[in-house]
């Protein structure tokens, strides 16, 4: 019984370590959770971020416009 319990504990610890490693990789993945949007006076497409007050850092956004409680961010 003790060996089986110890084996379960080892497997559980290994699962936690691998899950934490996957979360660290996912944090740095270049994945945007934005949809397409257009602002008045802009010809190209922007990224619509839902229920955000400002554009997120790290995507190179330079201009923006507000669409209700959402924000449309434009790179470069």
Curated annotation (Swiss-Prot):
**Keyword check for ATP-binding:** no
**Membrane: is it a keyword of this entry?**
no
Q: Which InterPro entries match?
A: BDS_K_chnl_tox, Myo_ane_neurotoxin_sf
Q: Gene Ontology terms, cellular component aspect?
A: extracellular region; nematocyst
Coiled-coil parts of chain: none
Give the Pfam families listed for this entry. Defensin_4 (PF07936)
Biological process annotations from GO: regulation of blood pressure
Signal peptide residues on this chain, from the entry's feature table: 1-19
Q: Which residues form the propeptide?
A: 20-31
Tissue specificity remark: Weakly expressed in the ectodermal tissue from the distal and proximal tentacles, body wall, and oral disk.
Cite the entry's keywords alphabetically.
Answer: Cleavage on pair of basic residues, Disulfide bond, Hypotensive agent, Ion channel impairing toxin, Nematocyst, Neurotoxin, Potassium channel impairing toxin, Secreted, Signal, Toxin, Voltage-gated potassium channel impairing toxin
Disulfide bridge partners, by residue number: 37-72, 39-65, 55-73
What is the role of this chain? Blocks Kv3 voltage-gated potassium channels. Reduces blood pressure.
User: Of which family is this protein a member?
Assistant: Belongs to the sea anemone type 3 (BDS) potassium channel toxin family.
- What is the official name of this protein in its record? Kappa-actitoxin-Avd4m
> What broad taxonomic lineage does this protein's source fall under?
Eukaryota, Metazoa, Cnidaria, Anthozoa, Hexacorallia
